[in-house]
Amino acid sequence: MATPVRDETRNVIDDNISARIQSKVKTNDTVRQTPSSLRKVSIKDEQVKQYQRNLNRFKTILNGLKAEEEKLSETDDIQMLAEKLLKLGETIDKVENRIVDLVEKIQLLETNENNNILHEHIDATGTYYLFDTLTSTNKRFYPKDCVFDYRTNNVENIPILLNNFKKFIKKYQFDDVFENDIIEIDPRENEILCKIIKEGLGESLDIMNTNTTDIFRIIDGLKNKYRSLHGRDVRIRAWEKVLVDTTCRNSALLMNKLQKLVLMEKWIFSKCCQDCPNLKDYLQEAIMGTLHESLRNSVKQRLYNIPHNVGINHEEFLINTVIETVIDLSPIADDQIENSCMYCKSVFHCSINCKKKPNRELRPDSTNFSKTYYLQGAQRQQQLKSSAKRTKVLEQDTKKVKQSVQQQKTGNY
């Protein structure tokens, strides 16, 4: 029997070649026994039917290969036998690769069908959503009663929304859709992520593409909307409004403010720029620029003495260092210290360091802080006057006593 040509042998499937390949074509009998799965099999895609027809056709070709192998084993020509066995070995390797590829395609289609059946069943009766991820072979579960707890109607809070969304999907082990190398995810996972992020969008927040079912388009729409309203000049003014000195009395509010400014900058840049060293240096310079000179040196000293924890971002480490320094240097609660700046109402610095302070000497009663010390000085001056008056009266009384004693001595003489 003539040896099949190369193009034919590439499509040959031999279900007797190896037990490993035979095991892959077995189907899940348990799933096929269910009524729902039977309905799915009855309307199986035409591509699967074509795969099955190819399997039957390949068996016929395989019989010819077996007959060829038997004839080779009966010949006395050792050299010819070796050459043809070598060619058959190469053909078998190609056939095995083709078999593995074909079987994987069949299994993938059947797995998708079984997953759809399972998803429909869980959606109807279960308490969670089932989905697949690119980063794990195990299925993930997202509780139906879980709600994304951040909601905003303000475009200025889009960076906070995206940052909280990133933390939220990491908690429930979704694929990180903010990574550069992830450009497509499982449709089921995409559907759930769209549901989650839309829970955080208020009705009055007019953002393009929020009605789409593509999570990547929603994220890009949010970022583009934010960029259009927050150019470089707007961001620079936002940094310049913040000034922190050693009198800061609300460290929690300060942390939220600095975090918001950092997120404002990070979400302006593309994915590839967010881990760029230049961005790290830029953010460090911006954060240090918010510190008054009375606080800046202490923060620099602390940064020098404390090594950076590689487990957190550089800007997060820098903000934590600023907050720790502020807490250590913040004044003890006292009625004599003003609660907020009289010029800009900020709780991060005192009036004397404010950028809006006019270039003139403050009147004694212009602020509570100055007025207190003015009153204390007036009281001290009054005390000194009273003391001087008592001393003068005492001197006059002493003089009168001396004169009286002198008169008595003169009379005796």
Curated annotation (Swiss-Prot):
Region (Disordered) location: 380-413
Disulfide bridges in this chain: none
Coiled-coil positions: 39-115
Alphabetical GO biological process terms: viral translational frameshifting
Function: Capsid protein (CA) is the structural component of the virus-like particle (VLP), forming the shell that encapsulates the retrotransposons dimeric RNA genome.
Source organism: Saccharomyces cerevisiae (strain ATCC 204508 / S288c)
Protein's name according to its UniProt entry: Transposon Ty4-H Gag polyprotein
Gene that encodes it: TY4A-H
Source lineage: Eukaryota, Fungi, Dikarya, Ascomycota, Saccharomycotina
Keywords associated with the record: Coiled coil, Transposable element
Protein's UniProt keywords contain Coiled coil: yes
Note: Retrotransposons are mobile genetic entities that are able to replicate via an RNA intermediate and a reverse transcription step. In contrast to retroviruses, retrotransposons are non-infectious, lack an envelope and remain intracellular. Ty4 retrotransposons belong to the copia elements (pseudoviridae).
Chain intervals with Low complexity compositional bias: 403-413
Highest taxon in the source lineage: Eukaryota
